[in-house]
Amino acid sequence: MSDTSILAYCRPGYENDTANELTSRYGEAGFYGYPVSKKNSGFAHYHLYDAAQLEQTVTQFAVHDSIFPRQLVAVFAAINDVEKEDRVGQVLDALKEVEKPFSIFGAVDVEYPDTEEGKTLAKFCRKFTVPLRQALRKAGWLTAKENLGKPKLHIFFASFEICYIGFTLPSHASRDHLGICRLKFPSDSPSRSTLKLEDALVNMLSNKQQSKVLRSGGRAVDLGACPGGWTYQLVKRGMYVEAIDNGLIADSLMSTGLVEHHAADGFTYRPQFGRVDLLVCDMIEQPDRVAKLMGDWLVKHWATHAIFNIKLPMKRRYETVVEAMTSLNSRLDALDDAFAVKVRHLYHDRDEVTVTIVRTSKDEV
C-alpha cells in the first residue's frame, strides 16, 4: 500500500525526541505533516500531508545535519501483513502499485530497528537481501552492479509482519548499515569513552576539518579528562594535551610526554599558554552551564575549535539541546569569525549529544 513519510532510525528511547525534531524542522520549512512514534521502537515517522513533497522533504537537510536521526528514509510504500510464503513477491507487488520515484536504484539495504526485538530480525534480513536483490534487478529496479552514486532502496522491517519501502540519496544519507558506525575499542585506551570522541572525529568532521583541528604538534585542553579516554584520541594524533581533572590520568598517557595533568576545576581552568587549538569536554554538568563555558573559551579565543558533549535530561531533550545551542550560537554569531557547528546524537553517545565547532573565516563559509 502507498505510504508517504520520512522514516527516521534512532536510538531506542529517543523516538519522541526524534519526532519532535522532525516536526519542528520540516514544519518550519513548510513541509507539513504529523509525527508517529512508539517508545523503544528504535524509529519514528513524519507523515506528510502532501505526498508530492516527499523527495523535496527528504532533501531539506542531510542526516548528518540533524541531531537525533541515524538515517532518514523517504518512505513511499508499506506492507502491513507480510506473509512468510513469498516475501520477495510481496515486495515486488507493493512496488508495482506505486509510481517509481527514480528510473533505477544503485543498491538495496534490508534493515531493522536497533532494538532487542530488532536483533531477532537481523539474521532473516541478511538472508533475505540476496534473493530480493536478484529479483529487483530482474524487475528493473536495481542496476546490474552496485552503484552507490545513485539513490538507494531501503526495505525496513519494523517486525516480521510490517515493512516500509523507501529511498535515500547519497548526498543526504548515512553510508552505514542501519545508520550505525561501529568502531573497535582500542585495547590500550584507558576508557571506553574514547569511542565517543573517535565517533565525532570520524563522522562529524570532514577530512579537511580533521587536518585543521587535529594537527600534529598542536595543543589541546581536555576538561574532565580522567582517566583519559578523550585525551587518548588527541595523543594518538600527536597533540599536546592539558588534561584537567581532580582524578588521575592513566600512566600510559602520562608516559608519552604529550600530557600535562592539572588537578583543577574545569570551570575555572585557563590554558597554560593563553590559548589552545582545540578544547574538548565531556564533563557531567547542566547543559546551559556547559554551553556557556564553551562559549567563553571560543569568544575569548582561549580555544580555536571545540568538541564537547551536552548531557541530556530525561524529558524535553530536543528542546534542551535547542535552547543550549541557540544561546551559544548567538554569542558566536556576534564575532568576526565564522563557525561550522554540528550537533549529533552519535551511536556511541548515551544520554548526551556531541557538538563540534570549527572556527573558519567568513570567506570560507
UniProtKB/Swiss-Prot annotation:
Keywords: Cytoplasm, Methyltransferase, rRNA processing, S-adenosyl-L-methionine, Transferase
Keyword field contains Methyltransferase: yes
Binding site for S-adenosyl-L-methionine: S193, C226, P227, G228, G229, D245, D265, D282
Annotated Gene3D superfamilies: 3.30.2300.20, 3.30.70.2810, Vaccinia Virus protein VP39
Active site (catalytic residues): K311
GO CC terms, sorted: cytoplasm
GO molecular function terms attached to this record: S-adenosylmethionine-dependent methyltransferase activity
Cited function: Catalyzes the 2'-O-methylation at nucleotide C2498 in 23S rRNA.
Protein name as it appears in the record: Ribosomal RNA large subunit methyltransferase M
